[in-house]
Amino acid sequence: MRTSSLVLFAAVAVFGAACTAAAGDESWKTIDANDRHVQDVALWAVAETDWASATGGLTLNTVDGAEKRFEAGVNYYRLTLEASSRVVAKYLRFQAVVYEEGDEHKLVSFVPIH
């Protein structure tokens, strides 16, 4: 009984890992970072983030990379961007994930990267 439980547990773990990998980064598609809509989404994300107020305001400099995922009628954008701060005299790099459904946007994450 104990051996069959371990085999079942291992099978479930492998299946779960396979499902996670299938739904992971492979579903993101690279898109044109210079596309006007991508630029608009990036501008919105920079204005929306708490980092903007914490650093005295952020200004979008460039979108260095852009990926898109379409899931259940919703667009998700994963953007690698560079912004500058009026207070911190240097360029900062961030990864932003934005949810877009119709005209509605939500900032899923906005994290600094190196």
Swiss-Prot record:
Coiled-coil region(s) at which residues?
A: none
List the transmembrane segments: none
Q: Which InterPro entries match?
A: Cystatin, Cystatin_dom, Cystatin_sf
What biological-process terms (Gene Ontology) are attached?
defense response
Q: Tell me yes or no: is Glycoprotein among this UniProt entry's keywords.
A: no
The molecular function GO annotations come to: cysteine-type endopeptidase inhibitor activity
Q: Where does the secretion signal sit in this chain?
A: 1-23
Where in the cell does this protein reside? Answer: Secreted
Single GO cellular component term: extracellular region
Q: A Pfam family in this protein?
A: SQAPI
- Purpose: Specific inhibitor of cysteine proteinases. Probably involved in the regulation of endogenous processes and in defense against pests and pathogens.
Q: Which family does it belong to?
A: Belongs to the cystatin family. Phytocystatin subfamily.
Question: Which protein are we looking at?
Answer: Putative cysteine proteinase inhibitor 9
**What is the species listed in this Swiss-Prot or TrEMBL entry?**
Oryza sativa subsp. japonica (Rice)
